[in-house]
């Protein structure tokens, strides 16, 4: 389940130059992020880990602002939103995706994974850079 609209403003992932020890680092593997921290089902624990290690992380806080059960999706959870974009955007009241979205998947102390939901492109952004947040929750 994802929020019907983006968080009000673009925000930084946060905690730049600081590795989050509670969140696995996910590197490139033939151009694809794989492993613990990137998978479907990892977003909730990633978000909790981010906030444990850095309680001021704007993207994770933005996702949690919807409620305790909401979280920043992992990169593969975000990719599922891309794969189901047409279905999601057909829901009454759903605001169309725009530009890049943060995932809860960390790359290293300086970067985190993001996805351009219109095209499906995945890549990295500096943690101090700003992107959109679309919160999700498990069901």
Regions of interest found by a model, annotated:
Residues 5, 56-60, 65-69, 75-139:
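C-terminal, surface-exposed recognition/capping segments
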Residues 2-71, 75-76, 80-82:
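Short aromatic-cysteine micro-motif
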